[in-house]
Amino acid sequence: SYLATFTLGATAAIAMAGAAMAQEVTNRVAADTDWAVFEVESPKECWAVTAPKETVNTRDGRVVSVRRGDILLFVTWRPEKSIAGEISFTGGYPFAEGSTVTMDISGTTFELFTEGEYAWPATPTEDQKIISAIKRGANAVLTARSSRGTQTKDTFSLLGATAMIEDAEQRCGS
């Protein structure tokens, strides 16, 4: 089921985020403007990834300073699991139980479902719609709520996204 794939994807995405940050020198295979591509061989996985250009955290309508882990937006290919172009987002904190993340790309909105510190679209079809919007858009704004009630708004540049998504797909597409 797609939800089971999400759960497996969550574990892999967490591992990838760590790998992306900790082993950038050895795993990064391409970069363009605000996006990069990482590749690992066993099992073969490729992902295009970007970090936000701006983050705003609010509680009760006031801007607050909070500690967050890595904040990343991914597009991932895992050929051995038949995953192609899976969108995922980590906000660097546990999301509020049962909450969703709103992704706004140049006025087109999408809903991502949360589990732990990660969020994904509901279906592979939705992944593809988001990828199309990313390729046409200038930025993506992701709004979410933490388990502590903090509202977060992360703005990601989409400059370089098309080239890096296509690069990752070429490396790992089936």
Model regions: which residues?
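Bacterial N-terminal signal peptides that target proteins for export
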Residues: 1-10
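Sec/Tat signal peptide C-region and signal peptidase I cleavage site
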Residues: 16-22
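A generic "folded-domain core" signal
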Residues: 22-174
